[in-house]
Amino acid sequence: MDGTQDHTPPAEGLFGRPLFSDPMARALSRVGVVDVGSNSVRLVVFDGAARSPAYFYNEKLLCGLGSGMSETGRLNPEGRVRALKALHRFQALAEGMGITPLTTVATAAVRDAEDGPDFCEEVLRETGLKLWVIDGEEEARLSAQGVLLGWPGSFGLVCDIGGSSMELANLSDGAVGRRLTSPLGPLKLSGIGGGKKGLKQHIRTVMEDLHAAMDHETGKRLFLVGGSWRAIAKIDMERRTYPLHVLHEYRMQPRDIGKVADFIAETDADDLRARCGISSGRMALVPVASLILRQLIRTFRPKDITISSYGIREGMLYEQMPQALRDRDPLIEACRFAEAKDARMPGFGKVLYSFVTPLFPRAGWQRQRIIKAACLLHDVSWRAHPDYRAEVCFDYATRANLGGLKHEERVFLGLALMHRYSNKRDGTRFDDLFDLLPGPDQQEAEILGKAMRLGAMLWLQPGEQPASLTWRPNLKRLELDLSREAAPLFGEVAEARFGSLATTLGAEPQVKITR
């Protein structure tokens, strides 16, 4: 989770006290938020108090409220009717789920339209929903808070694009700093004259003004938020034949933006839409959005680019979190929540972590948190059919909604969990994903998985440490120290697993019974 600071672990044991058992966290049972944007209207219901958001329900409609507004100054009539119907539906759904009142915000289109106040009154009268019309700086703040939901302690620049506006916000040590708003939304730019040349010049002028207002800062990590950016990322995945179709934490380098912009310009839009699974309404905005992104990269010169699937709606959830929950690692909290809910022996993950850590003496804090996550998740898929359990584990790690994970870390976690249940990984349907992880890291994930596979055989009473590992790389010797109480657990299967772990390490296995 680069771009963040290392935080001192809590005092309550290796993993700290689980925040989801705290009364303040439990109060966040279900939270419903509605975002009335220039292009889409969306309802999201977050479930539970895990630090990574669990999406209980997610529905959107591309209404195009801001379509044509640059010419008329008013909300799109058809979009207005469709948005009102969607809000009727969302309110009814919320009542059925028992999550009223909904928190409902409206952004640039409603904010700037002549008939925006009239639309707000109509929504209140017809649905009972109070639309909170937020200004551009508040929109930037909430979007940046959404990024913090996935990456606490982040540094960088957040850029959120909507249909009618584009917002910027600085992040420094997990705090939202300077915020700016601009009219650089694809729908808003439809009325700019002078053809493509005039449009490019207008974008460049506005972008340079934004850069000056941000004190000409360059070289930061750029977090991209918004549907048009996600659509461009999908297209870049298609261009690169990228194997992991998870948009959150998808990384691009500045040089990639010119390549994908050219790819968009040179490829038939309908063909791209079909290949990438992008709606026609969203695809219509992509060509202009790619021009905006290209100029953004030229002007701000970021060091790298990260897609954030978390934005304004997640920022609204973050707003309601107690600070103690905000400060926790979203990955570890989500894994602890999963262990408490699904593992056969909740709490054994901490014991297992102590058991496997001697094998990784040089692991930095980023790798240590992935090892912790693996230990917490090592048993949550026990209900899966034994023939498919290893693949289910890998699929869960690589595709689940887990925050604070780079793509290569997802693959590392998935491989470790796969080897928790299987010695081999050849011939699976995930072979193309393994290449996202360098060879030495693949071996380290295999070592972790086989160590967990062994440790899972050595259960005693909850909280007890029945065995310990000592890795002596200079001697190429792996020692297993068993307590007398645990010695009967070391049967033929456990012995075979210990031997497999030693073989992967290139070590001679040695067993001691002490204590």
Predicted regions and their residues:
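A short amphipathic beta-strand at an alpha->beta junction
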Residues: 505-515
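N-terminal glycine-rich anion-binding loops that anchor highly charged ligand groups
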Residues: 52-63, 67
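A secondary-structure boundary/capping signal
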Residues: 37, 106-107
